[in-house]
C-alpha cells in the first residue's frame, strides 16, 4: 500500500478499534457487576449484553444505504453521536431497564458497514485484504486491551464510570472521523427490490452466509471457553489474558503469510478452504481433548489464525463482487449477517449448554 492508503487504513482501523475497545471492555465485567442494578434479573442482564447485536443488525442496512446516498462521513458522525447518546443513558441510571435501552442506542449507531465501505472506496482492490487485515489486527489489539482495562476501570469507578469512559472513546472516534476527507456518494438510487436483488446474487449471499456462520461459531465458542478455562483450572479468571494475549499475537503472525499468499499469488479460494479446515480442527480439539494450558493455547491460536484469516478475506471478496454504487448497501447486508450470527450463536450456544453440557456446544460448531 502507498502512503495515502496506509494513512486511510490506519485512521479507519483506529476509529473501529477505539469504538470496539469501548464495547469489549463490558464483556468481562457486565454479568458480574450488573446484578447491582434495580430490577436486575439474569434475563435482563442477558438483554443488556445481547440487544446491542440486535440493533446493530437492524440498522446496518439503513446506514449502508444512506451512506451510498449522502456519503460515508456524515453517517459515521451520526452513528457515533447515537452511540454516545446510548453510553450517556446507560451511565446515568441505576435501573437495568435503562441500561438495556442505552445498549440498544449504542447498537443503533451501526457504522461498521459504512467504515468498511469507506475503506473499500479509498483503497485499491489489490490492497483491500491487507487493509482489512490491518483493521482486524487493530480490533484484536482492542480486544486484548479491553480484557485488562475493563475490570480495572470498573473496580475503580463502577459500571457507570465505565459507560462514561465508553462515551469518551466515541468522542475520540468522532475527532478522527472529522480528519477524514469527505467521501462523496458515487450514485443515488432508490432503496427498491431491484437494488436489493443486486446485492443478493449467489456470490454475495454465499459471503453473507459465511460471515454469519463465522460469527455464530465465535459467539457460541466464547460462551463456553471461559467456563472451560475455569473448569480445567488452566488460569484464574483474573489472569485469562495470559491465554488470550499470546494466542492473538501468535495468530496474527500465522495469519500474515496466509493473506500474502492469498493476495500475491491469487490463491484466495485455497487459503479460505485451509482456514475453514483449521477452524474445524480447532473445534474438534476443543471437543475431544483434555485441556491444559499448552493444549488450550495452541488450539486457541489455531482458532484465531483461521478466524482472522477468514475475517480478512471475506470483506475483500465482497468489495470485489459488489457493484461500486451499491457497495454500502452490500456491506450493510454483510454486517447485518455478521451481527445476527453473533446474536443467534450466543442464543443457541447458551441453549445447548443449558440443556446438555459445555462440550456439546463445540459439537454444534463443528457442523456449522
Label each region the model flagged.
Residues 269-314:
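C-terminal transmembrane helical hairpin of 12-TM major facilitator-type secondary transporters
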Residues 102-139:
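Cytoplasmic helix-loop-helix junction between adjacent transmembrane helices
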Residues 167-186:
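C-terminal membrane-cytosol helix-exit motif in multi-pass small-molecule transporters
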Residues 28-43, 223-239:
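Short amphipathic helix-loop junctions that connect adjacent transmembrane helices
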Residues 1-5, 181-210:
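Juxtamembrane intracellular "pre-TM" segments in multi-pass secondary transporters
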Residues 58-94:
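Conserved MFS/SLC helix-loop-helix module at the cytosolic interface between two early adjacent transmembrane helices
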Amino acid at each position: 500500500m502507498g502512503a495515502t492508503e496506509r494513512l486511510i487504513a490506519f485512521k479507519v482501523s483506529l476509529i473501529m478499534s477505539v469504538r470496539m475497545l469501548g464495547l469489549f471492555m463490558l464483556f468481562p465485567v457486565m454479568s458480574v457487576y450488573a446484578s447491582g442494578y434495580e430490577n436486575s434479573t439474569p434475563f435482563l442482564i442477558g438483554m443488556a449484553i445481547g440487544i446491542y447485536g440486535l440493533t446493530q443488525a437492524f440498522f446496518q442496512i439503513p446506514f449502508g444505504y444512506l451512506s451510498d446516498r449522502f456519503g460515508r462521513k456524515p453517517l459515521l458522525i451520526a452513528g457515533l453521536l447515537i452511540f454516545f447518546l446510548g453510553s450517556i443513558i446507560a451511565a446515568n441510571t441505576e435501573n437495568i431497564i435503562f441500561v438495556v435501552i442505552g445498549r440498544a442506542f449504542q447498537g443503533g449507531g451501526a457504522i461498521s458497514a459504512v467504515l468498511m465501505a469507506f475503506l473499500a472506496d479509498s483503497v485499491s482492490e489489490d490492497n483491500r485484504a491487507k487493509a482489512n487485515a490491518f483493521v482486524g489486527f487493530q480490533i484484536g489489539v482492542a480486544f486484548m486491551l479491553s480484557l485488562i482495562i475493563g475490570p480495572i476501570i470498573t473496580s475503580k469507578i463502577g459500571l457507570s464510570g465505565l459507560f462514561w469512559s465508553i462515551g469518551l472513546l466515541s468522542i475520540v472516534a468522532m475527532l478522527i472521523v472529522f480528519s477524514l476527507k469527505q467521501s462523496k456518494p458515487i450514485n443515488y438510487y432508490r432503496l427498491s427490490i431491484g437494488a436489493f436483488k443486486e446485492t443478493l446474487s449467489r456470490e454475495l449471499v454465499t459471503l453473507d452466509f459465511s460471515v454469519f456462520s463465522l460469527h455464530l461459531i465465535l459467539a457460541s465458542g466464547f460462551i463456553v471457553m471461559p467456563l472451560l478455562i475455569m473448569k480445567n483450572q488452566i488460569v484464574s479468571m483474573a489472569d485469562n489474558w495470559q491465554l488470550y494475549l499470546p494466542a492473538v499475537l501468535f495468530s496474527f503472525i500465522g495469519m500474515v503469510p496466509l493473506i500474502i499468499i492469498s493476495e500475491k499469488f491469487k490463491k484466495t479460494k485455497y487459503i479460505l478452504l485451509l482456514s475453514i479446515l483449521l477452524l474445524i480442527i480447532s473445534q474438534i480439539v476443543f471437543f475431544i481433548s483434555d485441556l491444559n494450558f499448552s493444549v488450550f493455547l495452541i488450539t486457541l491460536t489455531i482458532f484465531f489464525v483461521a478466524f482472522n484469516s477468514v475475517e480478512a478475506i471475506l470483506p475483500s471478496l465482497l468489495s470485489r463482487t459488489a457493484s461500486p454504487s451499491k457497495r454500502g448497501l452490500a456491506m450493510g447486508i454483510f454486517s447485518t449477517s455478521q451481527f445476527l450470527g453473533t446474536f443467534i450463536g450466543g442464543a443457541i450456544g447458551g441453549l445447548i449448554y443449558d440443556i446438555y453440557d459445555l462440550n456439546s456446544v463445540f459439537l454444534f460448531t463443528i457442523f456449522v
